[in-house]
From Swiss-Prot:
The keyword rRNA processing does not apply. Belongs to the LpoB family. Gene3D superfamilies: ABC-type transport auxiliary lipoprotein component (3.40.50.10610). The keyword Ribosomal protein does not apply. InterPro entries: LpoB (IPR014094). This is Penicillin-binding protein activator LpoB.
Length: 198
C-alpha cells in the first residue's frame, strides 16, 4: 500500500511540473520592415523628391536715360570732335555683382545718341553683317576693347563708344570711353553713379 501511494504521489508531482506541448503551425506572415534612406525622418518620399526650388535673382531696374544723357552731352563737347563723326556703339556690359537689363541700357544709349547731331551711328544691321564677316558671334558683346576697335576699323568708323556698368549692384557706376579707331586711343572718358528706378 505504501509503495502504491509513493508511486502515485511521484506521478502526480511529475504531471504538475510538465509544460504543455508547443503548438505547431504555420509561421505568421509579418510585413517586411523597410528603412528609408532617401528622405529624412518625418518627411515623406514625395516631399523629398519635390525638393526646394531656388528663387530666381531679381533683375535690377534703372532709368538708364538719367545717367546717360549728361554723359553723352559731355562727350559731344569733346575738343576737335567734328559733327557727323561715324560712331560704333558697343553693347553696354554688365561688370557688377548682379543682374541688369543690359538690352534696355543699350537701347536707351542708342536713342540718346540718335537725337544728338554730333555722331552718325552705324546701324544694327551693318554691325550684324560685319560680325558675320569677321566670324564674330551675333551674341558677342565685344567685351574686349581691341575687338571693338577691330570691328570699328572694318566698318570704317571713326570712333567706338565703350560702355560698362561696374561696382556693387545696389549702387552701380556707369563708365563710358570714347576711343579713336585709328589709334585705339581713349580721347574721352567719364563715369557717373546710377539710381534705382522708382
Amino acid at each position: 500500500m505504501k509503495k502504491y501511494l509513493l508511486s502515485a504521489s511521484i506521478v502526480f508531482l511529475l504531471a504538475s511540473c510538465a509544460q504543455p506541448p508547443a503548438k505547431i503551425g504555420r509561421p505568421s506572415k509579418s510585413e517586411p520592415s523597410t528603412v528609408s534612406t532617401d528622405s529624412p525622418e518625418g518627411i515623406s518620399s514625395e516631399s523629398a523628391e519635390i525638393g526646394i526650388v531656388p528663387l530666381t535673382p531679381k533683375i535690377k531696374s534703372f532709368d538708364w536715360s538719367v545717367p546717360m544723357k549728361p554723359l553723352v552731352e559731355n562727350m559731344s563737347q569733346t575738343k576737335d570732335l567734328p559733327n557727323g563723326s561715324v560712331l560704333l556703339v558697343d553693347t553696354v556690359k554688365n561688370n557688377t555683382n548682379g543682374l541688369l537689363q543690359i538690352e534696355k541700357a543699350t537701347e536707351s544709349l542708342l536713342h540718346i545718341l540718335s537725337s544728338n547731331n554730333t555722331f552718325f551711328l552705324i546701324s544694327a544691321n551693318q554691325l550684324a553683317k560685319a560680325k558675320t564677316a569677321l566670324g564674330i558671334s551675333k551674341q558677342d558683346n565685344l567685351s574686349s576693347r581691341s575687338k571693338a576697335i577691330a570691328l570699328g576699323r572694318y566698318l570704317k568708323a571713326e570712333y567706338v563708344l565703350y560702355t560698362d556698368v561696374s561696382d556693387d549692384i545696389q549702387s552701380p557706376v556707369i563708365n563710358m570711353e570714347l576711343m579713336l579707331v585709328k589709334t585705339g586711343e581713349i580721347i574721352w572718358a567719364d563715369k557717373t553713379a546710377m539710381t534705382l528706378a522708382p
